[in-house]
C-alpha cells in the first residue's frame, strides 16, 4: 500500500497516494476533490447510453476467492512457471498454497510472508513493463476463466448504476490493475512494489494491503473521490476484511470463510456463496442490492435533471 501524509494525485504508473492512517476520517467521509484520471463508467452490454453518474456511491471488491476463484497471485505464479521462470519445486509450492487456500477458505500469515519474500526476490531487477505484459498474458490464459460469474454480475450492477467499482486487494498492484482494466472497472488499490526508473528494487512501498490496511485505503479513497461511505458497498470472503466491511453502509460476504459467515449472520449482512450455488450466480444478483443500486441510479438521474 502506498501511504503518505498527504493526499496527492496518481503518479504515472497510476498509483494513488493515500492519506496517513494515523488520523482516519469518519466512515461517512467525503471531500470536494474531483476524480483524477478516472475512466468513464461502463454502460450495460448492448446499450449505447451511458448510465447516470452516481458520484457519492462506490463498490469495493476484494479479489482472491471473492472475485477470482482461489489466489490470483498463485494463478500468476502458475503462468510464470509455465514460462520457466520458476523451478518444479516452486510449482509444487504454488499448488500446495492454492490447495490449502481452497480447502480452508482463509489466508495464513506465514504463507503471506513467505509469498512476499519469494515475490520480491523474483521481481528484483526486472522491469515494470515486463511484469505488466506477463500479467496481461496470464490473465488471458488462466485468470479470466477463474472469475466468479456471480461476482462479475455484481460489479456490473454497480457500473450500470453509474457507480465507481474498485478492487481492494493484497494482490500486487500491476496484476490487480490488469484485472480491473479487463473487467472495465474504475481501478484498483493493491500492494505496491518499489520501482526506480521502471525497474523493481525488491522492496515494498509500505506494507501488504491487507486487513486494517484495506480499511485505511478505502477511507482515504473516499476522501479523494468525494464518496459517502454510508452509500458504499464492500464485498469480501475473508474475516480479515471485517475492518473494510464495517466501514460501509452495505457489507456483503462472498464465499465467506467460517468466521466471516458467522459474523455476517450476526450482523445481518448479505451472504452469497457461489462455490455451492453456481447456478444462482446466473439467475441474478441479490434483490436488495439490485434495488439499492437502481435507486442510486434513479437518484443521480433525478439530480441531473433538476440541475438543468
Curated annotation (Swiss-Prot):
GO terms for molecular function: L-phosphoserine phosphatase activity; metal ion binding. It is a single-pass membrane protein. It is found in: Cell membrane. Mg(2+) binds at residues 62, 64, 237. Its EC number is 3.1.3.3. Keywords: Cell membrane, Hydrolase, Magnesium, Membrane, Metal-binding, Transmembrane, Transmembrane helix. Coiled coil: none annotated. Its cofactor is Mg(2+). It catalyses: O-phospho-L-serine + H2O = L-serine + phosphate; O-phospho-D-serine + H2O = D-serine + phosphate. SUPFAM superfamilies: HAD-like. The keyword Oxidoreductase does not apply. InterPro entries: HAD-like_SerB, HAD-like_sf, HAD_hydro_SerB1, HAD_sf. Substrate binds at residues 90, 126, 169-170, 214, 240. Residues 1-48 are annotated as: Disordered. GO terms for cellular component: plasma membrane. It comes from the Bacteria. The chain crosses the membrane at residues 280-302. The active site is at 62 (nucleophile), 64 (proton donor). Its main location: membrane. Binds 1 Mg(2+) ion per subunit. NCBIfam families: HAD-SF-IB, HAD-SF-IB-hyp1. Likely catalyzes the dephosphorylation of O-phospho-L-serine into L-serine. This is Phosphoserine phosphatase SerB1.
Amino acid at each position: 500500500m502506498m501511504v503518505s501524509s498527504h493526499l496527492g494525485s496518481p503518479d504515472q504508473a497510476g498509483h494513488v497516494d493515500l492519506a496517513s492512517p494515523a488520523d482516519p476520517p469518519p466512515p461517512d467521509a467525503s471531500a470536494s476533490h474531483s476524480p483524477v484520471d478516472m475512466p468513464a463508467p461502463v454502460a450495460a452490454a448492448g446499450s449505447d447510453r451511458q448510465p447516470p453518474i452516481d458520484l457519492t456511491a462506490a463498490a469495493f471488491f476484494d479479489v482472491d476467492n471473492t472475485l477470482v476463484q482461489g489466489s490470483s497471485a498463485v494463478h500468476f505464479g502458475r503462468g510464470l512457471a509455465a514460462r520457466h521462470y520458476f523451478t518444479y519445486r516452486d510449482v509444487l509450492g504454488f499448488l500446495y498454497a492454492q490447495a490449502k487456500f481452497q480447502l480452508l477458505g482463509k489466508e495464513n500469515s506465514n504463507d503471506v510472508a513467505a509469498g512476499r519474500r519469494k515475490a520480491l526476490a523474483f521481481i528484483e531487477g526486472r522491469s515494470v513493463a515486463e511484469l505488466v505484459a506477463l500479467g496481461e498474458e496470464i490473465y488471458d490464459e488462466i485468470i479470466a476463466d477463474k472469475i466468479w460469474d456471480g461476482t462479475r454480475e455484481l460489479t456490473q450492477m454497480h457500473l450500470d448504476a453509474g457507480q465507481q467499482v474498485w478492487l481492494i486487494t493484497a494482490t500486487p498492484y500491476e496484476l490487480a490493475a490488469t484485472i480491473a482494466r479487463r473487467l472495465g472497472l474504475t481501478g484498483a488499490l493493491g500492494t505496491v512494489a518499489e520501482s526506480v526508473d521502471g525497474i523493481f528494487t525488491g522492496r515494498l512501498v509500505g506494507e501488504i494491503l491487507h486487513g486494517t490496511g484495506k480499511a485505511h485505503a478505502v477511507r482515504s479513497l473516499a476522501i479523494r473521490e468525494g464518496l459517502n461511505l454510508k452509500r458504499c458497498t464492500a464485498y469480501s470472503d475473508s474475516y480479515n476484511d471485517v475492518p473494510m466491511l464495517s466501514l460501509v453502509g452495505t457489507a456483503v460476504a462472498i464465499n465467506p470463510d467460517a468466521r466471516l459467515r458467522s459474523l455476517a449472520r450476526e450482523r445481518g449482512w448479505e451472504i452469497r456463496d457461489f462455490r455451492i450455488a453456481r447456478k444462482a450466480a446466473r439467475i441474478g444478483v441479490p434483490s436488495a442490492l439490485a434495488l439499492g443500486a437502481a435507486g442510486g441510479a434513479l437518484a443521480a438521474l433525478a439530480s441531473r435533471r433538476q440541475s438543468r
